[in-house]
Amino acid sequence: TIKDLQRKYNDIPNFHLTTGKIFVDGVLEGDPLSTPPMLPNAASLSDYLQPVFYQKEGIDLVQIERYIDPRAPECKKYFDLDTDKFIKLHKFHPNQCIESKGVFEHDLEFIENYTAALHGAGINVHSHTIGDRAFRAAIDAFESAKKMHPTSQGNFSVSHAQVIHPDDKPRLSDIEIFFAFTYSWIE
């Protein structure tokens, strides 16, 4: 158990198991200019937009021409053509027809159970969240752990929190979450 780990390493000077970290999701950065375009994998509440870019000759600036509608007729033909024919005909990669909301690093049950176990042992829980779906999963787990272990001395913190859905903002003070923002990403 977590308490056993704490006791096992308790005699090591300057080493204390006081905080456990969980990666709820991955990164927001994708590479839409690669072939095929690579989407971010941060867990989002809504599907990622799939841009088609253009670049004027002699100018380094890349601009968005349009976004792909995955429900459009050309995307219905996604499996009918090979990749090169699809790109030539439709001017975008067929993988851009695939809808994605990103992924969690672990399933939700693990996130909730791990958070509850740490909090129940009085250990601080630090969750890495980028997308708004990941942030919501983390604070849902915090709320659940707090209800299960109301006398725990463990705290909750979140790193990055690049995207927070407005509906989740009022919950933050009730849960008492500490934040570790990455300030270089603010602007």
PLM regions: where:
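Active-site neighborhoods of metal-dependent hydrolases
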Residues: 1-187
